[in-house]
């Protein structure tokens, strides 16, 4: 029996320990937001957070996440309460086909959690492992930059108003 936390809930599963995390989340827990793209950890469509770090889950055996915290796109925000990146994706009309977008958002969220004010080059480096076959890279980058800029503006306002 493998236990872990999935989107804030303690869960367990009794599957082959070599089963990729992606398939456990999709097939056993019915969370379909993370996608299968390549099966080799190259495209990023399957990206989830494991203890806060972006990880390609199509090549991550479920045994590797025992007792860890997993966050999927479903755990990042809700339709009623979007994560700032999800809102920015809408504002900047990022998706075209949408297939890769959950992985893109998860990679971007891990980046901004680790570095709230990334440079253009840092965004490129962090997002390099996520492929968008539709070529939406400029819109993806603008959305990430807008969230970073808005967070910095909010932090500056909070400090000015004595809330920080």
Indicate residue ranges for each PLM-predicted region:
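Signature of N-terminal electron-transfer/Fe-S-associated modules in redox systems
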Residues: 1-164
């Amino acid at each position: 029996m493998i236990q872990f936390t999935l989107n804030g809930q303690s869960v367990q599963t009794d599957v082959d320990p070599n089963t990729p995390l992606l398939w456990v989340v999709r097939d056993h827990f019915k969370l379909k937001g993370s996608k299968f793209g390549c099966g080799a950890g190259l495209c990023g469509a399957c990206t989830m957070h494991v203890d806060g770090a972006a990880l390609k889950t199509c090549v991550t055996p479920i045994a590797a996440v025992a007792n860890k915290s997993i966050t999927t796109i479903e755990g990042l925000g809700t339709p009623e309460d979007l994560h700032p990146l999800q809102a920015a994706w809408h504002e900047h009309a990022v998706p075209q086909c949408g297939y890769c977008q959950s992985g893109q958002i998860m990679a971007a969220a891990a980046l901004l959690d680790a570095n709230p004010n990334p440079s253009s080059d840092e965004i490129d480096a962090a997002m390099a492992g996520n492929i968008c076959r539709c070529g939406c890279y400029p819109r993806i980058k603008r959305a990430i930059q807008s969230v970073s800029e808005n967070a910095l503006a909010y932090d500056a306002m909070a400090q000015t108003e004595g809330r920080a």
